[in-house]
Amino acid sequence: VLRVLKDFGDKNGEHRVFDYFAAGWNRDGLALRGMGELMKSAPADKHLLILLTDASPNDSHKILPSGKIPLSRDYDGQPGIDDTAAEVRALRAQGIRVAAVFMGENTSVPAANAIYGRDLARIRRIDQLAAAAGRLIQDEIRELSG
């Protein structure tokens, strides 16, 4: 389930951002695919998606069998990381800039790097979120300008 708290054209919806609540599992790859669909209709030439993540995709629903892998698999660990990284690459291939603010365990640092590469800022406290997002935005502006 992907809940839009504020639409691109919504001029008065800032307060709804605070309606967010964690509701269970996080199938990151699917959420990224959904964001890609939403961003296609966004009225802008350039798109930047910044995520707050623990880099630990996990879902109770298994990954369905495919031609390469005939058995279903759990959506956690390496399969979840691989799926999420593939969706990040797909968004970037569509021209959507993807960056992440990582607030997770030390054991998840390799996953964060595998998924987001150099477009990543780590924070240890939530009060560092705005500064980290600001740095990522500045990096993107510099890259687009240079």
Where are the language model's segments positioned?
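Acidic, glycine-rich A-domain
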Residues: 1-146
